[in-house]
């Protein structure tokens, strides 16, 4: 082979190799940006994700009965989480649920005139509350992490004490229930919209070893710790409104959770009043 032909072949090989390397690099960059980029705040989530895709991650903090903070872990173990990319470690909780939220037995049921109908009704309410206060909250909340605030779609949990206003009955119990179910655990989140507080309104699914995949909003309705969302703004159900209303009806007819009360003010009514 002549020297000129040899040089031409080498140049062609180098060109082909360069094209392959460039293509592979661009493919890796595209794959990483599209599938492995971590979203650290609500506004990081691309519009293409909403209503179509699910995000995987860990619950690092639960501050209320219908919202929590979500640490996004795209790709899970295959995305390097736990061996290449650090996952926030939770701190074990030594306090009981009652100490975390205060003793609900001494709380007023409402901050307006409401008279219980006999001791039996009050006793039933306290009994209903106690089953939730006994739930185990295994971890403490982790704060100051790059997390997305998540608002559960389709439901409204009783309000806890905020800005000097008293808590609604079962507000603390809803918080404890939610902490027991998801704090420190992995969940799947389907973004639906962004609310006025810059929270991601989402449908949330978690794994239960005894019942498979669970819809978190639906489970709260079943246990009588939330009502179907009444607001007209940022109303999201992900095509499950009828199902949510059906299980709310069942919980109400069976007097589960907050429905044990003879007179009940919904979270929406409470927020309008205060």
Curated annotation (Swiss-Prot):
Ca(2+) binds at residue 156. Residues 53-261 form the TNase-like domain. Induction: By DNA-damaging agent methyl methanesulphonate (MMS) (at protein level). SUPFAM superfamilies: Staphylococcal nuclease. GO terms for cellular component: membrane; mitochondrion. The keyword Nucleotide-binding does not apply. It is found in: Mitochondrion; Membrane. SMART domains: SNc. Keywords: Calcium, Endonuclease, Hydrolase, Membrane, Metal-binding, Mitochondrion, Nuclease, Transmembrane, Transmembrane helix. The chain crosses the membrane at residues 15-32. Disruption phenotype: Leads to long chronological lifespan. The active site is at residues 151, 159, 199. The keyword Zinc-finger does not apply. It is a single-pass membrane protein. Its EC number is 3.1.-.-. Belongs to the LCL3 family. Present with 704 molecules/cell in log phase SD medium. PANTHER family: EBNA2 BINDING PROTEIN P100, SERINE_THREONINE-PROTEIN KINASE 31. This is Probable endonuclease LCL3. It comes from Saccharomyces cerevisiae (strain ATCC 204508 / S288c). The gene is LCL3.
